[in-house]
């Protein structure tokens, strides 16, 4: 995963290899898709400074995605929030690789969290990055900051790491 930012948005690039994809082409073409975490997916959980909840963005290898705001994991979710996410996905089945480039505008985040302040150099937000890969029973779960739960569960905000805005276009994590 690589990332950067500018005055308008956050950008994340994921590069994923696979042995066997878990996708459901019946879910439709690229675009908003419910329950995407049941298939191969990359996930971004982001909590800006001062925000009590966090944003969740999931993207699959077919370009399907979902966005929501989590007030409290599994208890209080806002499915109506719209991220205005821009997603570009490349899937190469022959080389067993897929890649995601996503753009998340600050303006859209502010519609759910009006107190959002545009990041400045030195600001720290909370973040975790995930990947779910493969088919059952060999399904695998990857986390930048592992949650150490008995059953796979990424909704553990205390496990989020720090995303430090170092300079225009540069983060430290």
Stretch-by-stretch model annotation:
Residues 1-173:
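Structural preference for beta-rich elements and adjacent junctions enriched in aromatics
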């Amino acid at each position: 995963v690589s990332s950067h930012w500018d005055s308008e948005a956050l950008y994340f690039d994921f590069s994923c290899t696979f042995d066997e994809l878990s996708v459901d082409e019946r879910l439709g073409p690229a675009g908003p898709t419910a329950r995407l975490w049941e298939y191969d997916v990359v996930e971004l959980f982001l909590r800006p400074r001062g925000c009590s909840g966090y944003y969740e963005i999931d993207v699959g290898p077919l370009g399907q995605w979902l966005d929501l705001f989590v007030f409290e994991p599994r208890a209080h979710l806002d499915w109506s929030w719209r991220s205005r996410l821009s997603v570009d996905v490349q899937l190469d089945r022959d080389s067993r690789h897929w890649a995601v480039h996503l753009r998340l505008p600050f303006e859209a985040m502010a519609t759910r969290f009006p107190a959002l302040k545009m990041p400045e150099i030195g600001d720290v937000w909370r973040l975790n990055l995930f990947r779910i890969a493969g088919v059952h029973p060999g399904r695998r779960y990857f986390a930048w900051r592992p949650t150490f739960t008995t059953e796979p569960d990424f909704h553990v905000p205390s496990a989020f790491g720090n995303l430090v805005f170092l300079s225009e276009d540069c983060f430290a994590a």
